[in-house]
């Protein structure tokens, strides 16, 4: 199973920020921000992100600082093949940033799928290489 690493998360947060101009966070199941367009938030606890990860529900926050480490915005849990990947949080008025959270989710799915396909392709290439190297040995045994 694939996991979202910091490199993939950074691709998503930076791309989405370029589109919407808002801060974007990736939050793990423990509620820790592991990638963000705001470097000061990386490694900090995000209470609503943690709650969204635990419940699997999208949570909208309508005011800053009502919850520990949380700003106004939307927090969307991301699943891939029914497996929790992360929570994507986007700062701003929920009605304005909701569409960007869904965009970030779609981009994340596409990048995970791309990695999955690359791994499958690499595995098949490795198997072909092994078979081609083993073929002369099998021919010698057959003689």
Give the positions of each predicted feature:
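Hydrophobic, helix-rich cores of sensory/ligand-binding and other regulatory modules
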Residues: 2-143
């Amino acid at each position: 199973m694939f996991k979202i690493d910091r490199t993939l998360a950074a691709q998503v947060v930076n791309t989405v920020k370029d589109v919407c101009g808002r801060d974007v966070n990736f939050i793990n199941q423990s509620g820790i921000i592991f990638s963000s367009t705001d470097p000061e938030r990386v490694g900090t606890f995000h209470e609503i992100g943690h709650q969204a990860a635990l419940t699997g529900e999208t949570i909208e926050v309508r005011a800053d600082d009502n919850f520990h480490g949380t700003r106004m915005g939307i927090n969307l849990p991301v699943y891939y093949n029914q497996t929790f990947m992360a929570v994507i949080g986007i700062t701003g008025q929920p009605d304005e940033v909701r569409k960007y959270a869904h965009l970030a989710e779609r981009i994340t799915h596409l990048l995970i799928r791309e990695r999955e396909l690359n791994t499958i392709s690499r595995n098949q290439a490795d198997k072909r290489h092994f078979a081609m190297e083993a073929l002369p040995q099998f021919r010698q045994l057959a003689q």
